[in-house]
Amino acid sequence: MSSHKPVRPNEALHKEALEELDAKINEAKKRFNEHKEKLGAIRGGGSLQEKNAELRAELDNIRNAQAAIRSSKQTLINKVKAQDELLKKKVKELTAMKKTVPFKSEVELDKHVKQLQAAVDSGTLKIVDEKKYLREISQCNRTRKSFVELNALQTSIDTIRNELNELRDQLNDSESKKLSDKFVEIRSELDEVRKQQDGYYKDQRKLIAERDDEKTALDDLYNQRRALQREYDTQLRAFRTYEREQRAKRQEQFRLERENREKEKRRIAAQRKLEEASIPAFTEEILACENLLKVFHVPVESSTTNAVSTGNTSSKILKPRTLTPRTVDPIPEGTIIKKESSDDAMFSGLKKSKPKKSNKSNNNQADSDRLNLSFGTIKEFDFVGVPAPFTKSQVDSAVEQLKSRIAHFKEQQDSVTKQRIEKAKQEIEKLEAKYNSKEEKTLTEADMVISSEETVTVTNDLEVEATA
């Protein structure tokens, strides 16, 4: 990698230069295609030859249409005569039918029927006149059917007349005139195409030389465009490579810093775990037993305390156990405490009576033998696995058990401490192995990502070059 930082190429300027070259290429390509077209017309190809064939095909179609018109005229004349005779016959039938109908239209018939019906409904007519009007109304209704036949006949006449007009229009020579005009127009275009082809034949050598010159100029422009695109791609590839390498360096630096931090954390955690495991086993139990012996004023040689205090950091990890004093909730202010004489009898299960002197002496003896221990002291006895004494007579047994527990703890202390240290070392080794495998997997994934980025970059560059 070069020492200086590559500069990213200006994409806007590059596109502007490409557009300028593309415009020149399009102009050169247009001139080249024109010369190629002229040579193709001379050699029997190109647009002029195709146009010549199209014009000839149109002339053939016009000739066929004119021949068909000439052959079909006689048939049209026969059809016109037949339709004209049919029209005259229908008109005569319509005229004869109208003479049989006394009314000009159906509207006039309806008006007359309404007048007759109004006269009948008025009730002022004589019976003879009324019968006459009714017969006339019936006759009018029968006449109404004749109007239906008249309308149908009139529709048929209109249809025949329209068909006759169409046939007469076809007999006119306007279509033939249009075809003739079209024939002359196409013939003129065909003559013009032939003149152009004749001119191309005369200048064939000149056209070939001009075409070769245009081809050379076009190839030169294409080479300029490829060189410009290649230079841009090279600069862009160098810039991307530099950026990728810088990003990889930053990622590697971050990874090393993170790895160092993780190593330091693991070292401190492993050191703490080993220090905790190196604390002599049963230290808290032995301290608890010694504190309990001190409660009963038994002299104790605290070798465990001295061993703990000689360590570098063990004394910071292990805190001395203290006996929690018994606490009593305070009585709210203003509370009146009242003792009833029946309470003793209730809880003792005896009848309410005046206690005898002998019972009083026994109670005093029991109170003097009772041993009051705090709740914290009782919890310490439970912690070391020794029953707590609740009378003075049980103190000696509890002291012996405490001494026995201290001896047992000290006897097992070295072996249990070694086991704890060995177990802590194994746990540290497992954690280190797990971290190393995880770190290797992370590095492999990072290498795969960088490799894929390089592949994508190379592929994009190749696509750009292929497009250019």
UniProtKB/Swiss-Prot annotation:
Biological process terms in GO annotation: intracellular mRNA localization; mRNA metabolic process
Protein name: Uncharacterized protein C458.02c
Top-level taxon in the UniProt lineage: Eukaryota
Upper taxonomic lineage: Eukaryota, Fungi, Dikarya, Ascomycota, Taphrinomycotina
Keyword line: Coiled coil, Cytoplasm, Phosphoprotein
Modification Phosphoserine occurs at: S342
Stretches the record annotates as Disordered: 324-369
Ranges in coiled-coil conformation: 10-94, 147-279, 399-445
Subcellular location: Cytoplasm
An annotated Gene Ontology molecular function: mRNA binding
Organism: Schizosaccharomyces pombe (strain 972 / ATCC 24843)
GO cellular component annotations of the record: cytosol; endoplasmic reticulum; nuclear outer membrane-endoplasmic reticulum membrane network; ribonucleoprotein complex
